[in-house]
Regions:
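N-terminal helix-cap/turn-to-beta initiation motif at the start of protein domains
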Residues: 1-14, 25
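Contiguous, well-ordered beta-strand patches that form the walls/edges
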Residues: 15-24, 30-87
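Short acidic DE-rich linear segments
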Residues: 91-93
Length: 93
């Protein structure tokens, strides 16, 4: 998967609504979504205004529009609902 040179997504992004859910983007185009004790790994491509995420085991990838401002990540989900995540530093493996 391709990686933008200035990858602003790298790090741990915790859901503001559900603090036990977080996107964890690694600098190598890999990552995982954590939810409680579980996690689902994915590969991603940062397209600057959108991110394409392909969860391991899923048939197709999904593309989500996003913006980042002041350590807040806003992702538009498949239902066109904006979901808010707060940057929490480095990825916790």
């Amino acid at each position: 998967m391709g990686i933008a040179m200035d990858n602003r997504l790298v790090g741990r992004w915790e859901s503001v609504q559900l603090s036990f859910c977080a996107y964890n983007f690694l600098p190598d185009g890999e990552g995982f979504y954590s939810f409680g004790e579980g996690k689902k790994e994915f590969a991603y491509t940062d397209n600057i205004e959108s991110v394409t995420i392909h969860f391991n085991g899923d048939f197709m990838a999904s593309t989500f529009r996003y913006t980042i401002e002041d350590d807040v990540l806003l992702i538009e989900d498949n239902f066109k609902t904006t979901v808010k995540y707060k940057k929490q530093g480095e990825v916790l493996l």
